[in-house]
Amino acid sequence: MYVPAADRYENMTYRRCGRSGVLLPGISLGLWHNFGSLTPFTNQRALLRTAFDLGITHFDLANNYGPPYGEAERNFGLHMEADWHTHRDELFLSTKAGYDMWAGPYGDRGSRKYLIASIDQSLKRMHVDYVDVFYHHRPDPDTPIEETMGALDQIVRSGKALYAGISNYYDPDQAERAIRELRRLGTPCLIHQPNYSLLNRTIEQGLTDVLRKEGVGCIAFAPLANGLLTGKYLDGIPEDSRMIRDGRYLKKDRLDPETLNRIRGLKTVAEERGQTLAQLALQWVLRDETVTSALIGASRPEQIRENVKALDAPPLTEAELQRIDGLTA
């Protein structure tokens, strides 16, 4: 029987999510990869236990994480039954819907029918009565934003989720409309989940200003750029890498000379600070309190242990930030 580490809350940094009462760990664990049918169940269990023992209380999923679709939630539900059923109130769980999930016109995008059906399916797979956050996973130009946000409001009011969130709403005006519609309905938007890293700074073009103004938290997914910011691709493509195993999200054309030179420059900054490149990348994402948490993935427990050390590093100096801007802005 799993017994969590007694000191799990002593060393983790928790940050306030926007202007809410919610605190999230500086590093959260995403189950986008490595929790489907291709990853041994024992390895999944080791990742979850390692994270929780380090004070990581937030696990993030989506309805179509796998492979196949739904498998990450299904596997998490088995872990929930085995290890976490007596610790549910210590966990902050999220899932999402918005991308393709099942066949036909009602298994994708942002309709009320899709979102309500999806949360019901997710709760069954995850073996929980509710999630802490339910996100709309991406904007849907074909569905009125009032319908999509109305569905999130209904899900919260029905007790199937405690909070509403949005993800991949990169247009600042569109994000603001969604946030204000949720507020009008009486279910404030807790959090936005965008892609944000040293190699993708799109959210700095107005979105972070909106989140700050509206008091909405931000959790950055892919802060290590799907592994590019670990440095593992600087000397070629490892045979066991995700780029070889599954090239859908990280393609070989990302390894262009300009990107590789940027990564080498960032690695030099990290080494001068006594850090790994991944630790520098995570610390940089969290340099602004607008970003509540950095959402990491992991294939081995030691990756989680190393990444959490980013929270203990000395602050980045102004000179270091300027060097980083010169390499990435």
Identify the function of each model-found stretch:
Residues 18-36, 94-107, 130, 135:
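N-terminal small/glycine-rich loop or linker at the start of catalytic domains
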Residues 1-91, 157:
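N-terminal binding-site loop/beta-alpha segment at the start of enzyme catalytic domains
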Residues 39-51, 110-126, 175-179:
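Short, acidic/polar
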Residues 22-27, 55-57, 85-91, 128-132, ...:
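Short, well-ordered coil/turn segments that N-cap beta-strands
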Residues 2-11, 139-328:
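Beta/alpha (TIM)-barrel catalytic core signal, keyed to glycine-rich beta->alpha loops juxtaposed to Asp/Glu
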Residues 123-143:
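Active-site groove signature of glycoside hydrolases
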Residues 88-101, 193-195:
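A short, structured active-site edge motif that brings together acidic residues
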Residues 39-43, 71, 75, 106-114, ...:
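Alpha-helix N-cap and loop-to-helix initiation/capping positions
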